[in-house]
């Protein structure tokens, strides 16, 4: 039986957004006096909160981070947002899940207005019951950092009606990959969070829902394994099989 409530990350999970994001980061760095000709080196910016990436990768302070994000938006909001494509098979997956009655949500660190623009641009907004992204103040809040995704997942779960504390599971190893029968011990495990980075898996774990990683995005299989993914899909087709086979 399929998961009845499924949260998706956006960048690197539903859409191949790397080109637009990396070029916009490159532009922002140039404006800050930093030259980075190799776009591949900027791919780690896809997924994590921007403030965290600029701080950790370029040692920027709070004021510099705010300026870098401003320059990033100058490029991304008008051009980079459209240098993007839906991964092959994603439309069909969303249609299938929608038709079988699963409720779908977006939990993204991207600013919420941008999330809506991307989904509407590709004509897939209608599949989602709940769409959650960050607010400007959250994106700029240097104290938020990696906790941003945890909050987005929590908000999306609340939008789907899941509130309160998780029930205790009898088996402490209930999150191990390959143990679908144990996932049924906790109602929250009928909810899945799908993403391509450790931040997505951490967001799922912190909110006690099933963590489903996808290795076709911008994070490696190793990153997902180390973050404790319950399941990992190497293709969109495999993701579909996981989401329709292991839900409670």
Please provide the spans of the model-predicted regions.
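A short acidic, helix-capping loop that chelates divalent metal ions and anchors anionic groups
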Residues: 53, 76, 80, 115, ...
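Structural recognition of alpha->loop->beta junctions
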Residues: 123-133, 223-243
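Metal-dependent phosphoesterase signature
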Residues: 55-92, 165, 173-174
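Active-site neighborhood of HAD-like aspartate-dependent phosphohydrolases
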Residues: 1-44, 58
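Short, acidic loop-to-helix structural element flanking the phosphoryl-transfer center
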Residues: 2, 78-106, 110-116
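Substrate-recognition "cap/lid" segment bordering the active-site pocket of phosphatases
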Residues: 112-192, 198, 202-206
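Helix-loop "lid/cap" segments that line or gate small-molecule binding pockets
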Residues: 28, 49-62, 118, 152, ...
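Acidic, Mg2+-coordinating phosphoryl-transfer loop and its flanking beta/alpha structural elements
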Residues: 193-231
């Amino acid at each position: 039986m399929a998961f009845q409530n499924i949260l998706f990350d956006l960048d690197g999970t539903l859409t191949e957004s790397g080109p637009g994001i990396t070029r916009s980061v490159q532009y922002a760095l140039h404006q800050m006096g930093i030259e980075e000709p190799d776009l591949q080196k900027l791919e780690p910016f896809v997924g994590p909160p921007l403030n965290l990436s600029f701080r950790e990768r370029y040692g920027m302070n709070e004021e510099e981070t705010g300026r870098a994000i401003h320059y990033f938006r100058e490029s991304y909001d008008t051009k980079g947002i459209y240098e993007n494509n839906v991964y092959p098979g994603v439309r069909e997956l969303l249609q299938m899940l929608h038709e079988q009655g699963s409720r779908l949500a977006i939990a993204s660190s991207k600013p919420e207005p941008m999330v809506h623009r991307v989904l509407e641009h590709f004509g897939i907004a209608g599949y989602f019951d709940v769409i959650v992204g960050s607010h400007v103040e959250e994106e700029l809040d240097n104290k938020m950092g990696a906790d941003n995704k945890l909050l987005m997942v929590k908000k999306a779960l609340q939008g789907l009606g899941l509130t309160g504390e998780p029930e205790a599971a009898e088996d402490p190893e209930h999150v191990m990959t390959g143990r679908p029968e144990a996932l049924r011990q906790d109602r929250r495990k009928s909810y899945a969070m799908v993403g391509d980075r450790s931040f997505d898996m951490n967001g799922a774990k912190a909110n006690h829902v099933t963590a489903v990683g996808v290795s076709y995005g911008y994070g490696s299989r190793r990153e997902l394994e180390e973050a404790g993914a319950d399941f990992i899909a190497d293709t969109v087709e495999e993701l579909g099989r996981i989401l329709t086979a292991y839900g409670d």
